[in-house]
UniProtKB/Swiss-Prot annotation:
This protein's record includes keyword Ribosomal protein: no
Organism: Paraburkholderia xenovorans (strain LB400)
Induction: By stress conditions e.g. heat shock.
Gene that this polypeptide is encoded by: dnaK
Domain of life: Bacteria
Name under which the protein is recorded: Chaperone protein DnaK
Keyword Phosphoprotein: yes
Family, similarity comment: Belongs to the heat shock protein 70 family.
An example Gene Ontology molecular-function term: ATP-dependent protein folding chaperone
Gene3D superfamilies to which the protein is assigned, alphabetical: 1.20.1270.10, 3.30.420.40, Actin, Chain A, domain 4 (3.90.640.10), Substrate Binding Domain Of DNAk, Chain A, domain 1 (2.60.34.10)
Amino acid sequence: MGKIIGIDLGTTNSCVAIMEGNSVKVIENSEGARTTPSIIAYMEDGEILVGAPAKRQSVTNPKNTLYAVKRLIGRRFEEKEVQKDIGLMPYKIIKADNGDAWVEVRDQKLAPPQISAEVLRKMKKTAEDYLGEPVTEAVITVPAYFNDSQRQATKDAGRIAGLEVKRIINEPTAAALAFGLDKNEKGDRKIAVYDLGGGTFDVSIIEIADVDGEKQFEVLSTNGDTFLGGEDFDQRIIDYIIGEFKKEQGVDLSKDVLALQRLKESAEKAKIELSSSQQTEINLPYITADASGPKHLNLKITRAKLEALVEELIERTIEPCRVAIKDAGVKVGEIDDVILVGGMTRMPKVQEKVKEFFGKDPRRDVNPDEAVAVGAAIQGQVLSGDRKDVLLLDVTPLSLGIETLGGVMTKMINKNTTIPTKHSQVYSTADDNQGAVTIKVFQGEREMAAGNKLLGEFNLEGIPPAPRGTPQIEVSFDIDANGILHVGAKDKATGKENRITIKANSGLSEAEIEKMVKDAEANAEEDHKLRELADARNQGDALVHSTKKALTEYGDKLEAGEKEKIESALKDLEETLKSGSSDKAAIEAKIEVVATASQKMGEKMYADMQAAQGAEAAAAGAAGAGGAGASAGGASQQQDDVVDAEFKEVKKD
């Protein structure tokens, strides 16, 4: 069985790790970096760029370069968070036929899981290049506060990328695994994981206990905001720059897509620089132009200014911390360690706020960019059976229930219930002779069902006529270890049953996923063909260069017919290469013709080299012999009185 890899599929950056024995390896990608930007670019010729290459060209191709797609995964188009993003993103967010938020690129309609699958495929390839073998299984992390639709969509993304997702694991829980197994502290400890990433915020309170030599990680509570992260911090800086530039130059940059992309890049850099310095300068020449000519942007931003701009965002992370502490039934003073995860936690003001709330310095010995992928890799090792000393008890982040009479949300499973879990309850009909019931499943904490997230609905039909309140309908909820819900309804009188895995009326259908898997496989095949074509073209170019060089040196030693044959074959190959031909077989055939025609010249070159080496060796031998004679003669002239010693040959046994 191959290794199960751990993937942190992040909003801004992604990371992949594997376990090698008891040590973990965070794998560098083809560019040599341990994290990969979660950016995907769709090029005019159909090529798809992922990671750093996509990021590099984003300024010149903003409408077809997708980033922060994780903020759309598993979301409906009408959700206010999606509507907010529509105005901010340079790419086009559209409403899919099923009501989900999708993206339109180069006249193609793409689902967020399909786009995220490109990043997962890059992570898969990174691991395969390192291991030298195919990888088919993975543990993928999600924000702890992701709802059922978002978890299901992430699982779908894995499938489209050609991965069997063995487990969906919460990011803070993964970070706790990485921390808990790395440190050898004995006894029970309560830790708080504060995870502020590129697009999401989570906080989890986790108890790490030693139980008979086994480390047990029990999540006591979790809370968060799936639409709060580094992207929002960047946006505050961008808005500030736009405002200042408008005041100074009278030009509104918010309508200029190219300028916005440059501003985004600069805002991110400024934010990072201000974590280690007190002031930074944003310098963007030729940012735009008007009738009076080109405009240049030059602006100084201090750390104090940045902190003032984002203070409210940092403050928004504290309330979930309060709720998580309360839900866990612990006091702030009982928290032994505070772990910071996510790139945004490098910001000094964030660290200061966390220290202020928890009353202690956060740990500095956890890598905020890699801990989540490391934890996922550890869970992969547990699932493959190679590790027996770890037990992970995670929770469902939000309450689950059904809509009952009057639009009330009747909770079946409360938030922070340890998973996997099952719960069933008996309900009845609201009207006389009601022949069917519709079960509507919701997730959330509001009292009224309409205020929560509708996960899906289904019907139980064929209920025998009876007065209201008489039929007994048992509704069962079953949450698996991935946090994904399965619901069943059964008429106890007739035994009729209907069970579904909650696939919201949104989400991808099985047929759509199958199609995307096939498209992805076709893309991989196409990529392989393009790679082989590029290799053939490179081989052809190299052969043209080396043959021309050899002709310059040895052409006059060839018979006229032979030389013409080579020149004709060369011309043919060059023309094929210059025409941009995508016929690999034709290029290879022309390469073969040049190679065959050049055989005689190769033989002559080889013979000349042999002759030259022979001449050199002969010259060296003659020089050596002459030199020896001269020195011997000289010696005899100068030393006539020297007596020759007798010698005898000693034979070895």
